[in-house]
A protein has these predicted regions:
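Intrinsically disordered, low-complexity Pro/Gly/Ser/Thr-rich segments with frequent PxxP/GP/PP motifs
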Residues: 1-31
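Beta-strand/loop-rich accessory regions of lumenal/periplasmic or secreted enzymes
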Residues: 14-19, 48-355
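Beta-sandwich strand segments
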Residues: 34-43, 329-330
Length: 355
């Protein structure tokens, strides 16, 4: 097809019935070698979403009983021969035992609002010449990296088919409330944990880097499968080359080894994630995630990638929302307004289940 030309291609009849995801992928490739471009070299691509699969989850059809045990420190829910153990001092899921009694978590499921700083977050700051406008300096100045968790309320409801645990938490930064959340855990008879999160931020503070969750899984699998944007890392303002798809990748492909360790490897618009026995599903809007042998804490502290040390299990970060990375000019806090988390209220939902 010549430059500026047009072509019509009629597609065969497609099953538009809601039972499958349908995408139309178009690639523009060179027919033959042209200057520096080899033949069959992709010069452009575009993806069109024709249909998204409609998913329903049957949580009631289970013969398993669901029981509740409570003492002064812990709340234990037994469902589908598994145990979900909550820490009553902070409302976090602190332990998850499978049907054989194997521990699935090495670090509790907690909320997370910061990221290991990117070069762009640091900007032109130096030890002796701090740039107060840099995102990292703004987050540090208000205390986002030293948040104090204040449990306000924890309410438990039990029915025949589920246990609902509602946790209200304030996150204090240098004596002021920066964030408030209500986490609603729904544990069903089939062993599924649905987590609904309502988030509110103090708009006097800078916008956070992310609004999400963090947990350290005991499992260390070789591969990960997910349905979302890929195959490479992508962020709100760095996703133009990514495509929706069912991606099956090695866990080593999920990190990007930047010379200076930082937040990396995010995959956005994820509907479903499968890693080892764990299945994570988006309920409503999609989520973003990254999987790594390195915690955000270690990434933030080490100065070079080769200094990183693999940790036990696998760190999983799940974000309902994540700000852009900026870097339009490579040295200033240039994240566009549309990619900042400026709203006062956010909501997201994800479900966790062992397969």
């Amino acid at each position: 097809m010549p430059a500026g030309g047009a072509m019509r291609i009629d597609l065969s009849e497609l099953p538009i019935d809601g039972t499958d995801n349908l995408f139309l992928d178009i690639q523009v490739k060179t027919i033959e070698k042209y200057n520096l471009l080899e033949s069959d070299f992709e010069v452009a691509h575009q993806q069109f979403v024709l249909q998204e699969k409609i998913n329903f989850t049957d949580r009631i059809d289970s013969s398993e009983e669901i029981t509740l045990l409570e003492d002064e420190e812990l709340l234990t829910v037994r469902s589908a021969k598994q145990k979900f153990i909550f820490n009553k001092s902070n409302g976090n899921l602190s332990r998850w035992l499978d049907e054989k009694g194997n521990e699935k978590l090495l670090h509790e499921l907690s909320e997370q609002f910061t990221r290991a700083p990117l070069d762009n977050d640091i900007g032109v700051s130096e030890v002796e010449h701090i740039d107060s406008n840099a995102w990292l300096e703004r987050w540090k100045a208000v205390g986002f990296y030293e948040l104090k968790t204040l449990l306000k309320n924890m309410i438990i409801q039990a029915t025949e088919n589920e246990v609902i645990i509602s946790v209200q938490t304030d996150y204090e930064a240098k004596g002021k409330i920066a964030f408030s959340t209500i986490r609603e855990y729904h544990i069903f008879r089939n062993g599924e944990l649905l987590l609904k999160v309502d988030f509110k931020r103090n708009i006097e503070f800078p916008e956070p880097a992310r609004i999400g969750l963090c947990l350290q899984l005991a499992e260390k699998a070789e591969n990960v499968t997910y349905f979302g944007l890929g195959p490479d890392e992508n962020y709100p303002d760095r996703r133009g080359a990514s495509l929706f798809g069912q991606w099956n990748l090695r866990i080593t492909d999920m990190t990007t080894p930047y010379i200076f360790p930082s937040e990396n490897g995010l995959r956005m618009e994820t509907r479903e994630l499968n890693y080892g026995r764990l299945k994570v599903r988006a309920m409503g809007q999609s989520f973003a995630f990254n999987l790594s042998p390195y915690s955000q804490n270690q990434l933030a502290k080490k100065g070079h990638w080769h200094l990183l040390e693999e940790e036990a299990g696998t760190w999983l970060n799940i974000d309902g929302f994540h700000m852009g990375v900026g870097g339009d000019d490579s040295w200033s806090p240039s994240v566009a307004q549309e990619y900042l988390l400026t709203k006062g209220n956010y909501h997201y939902e994800v479900s966790f289940k062992l397969t």
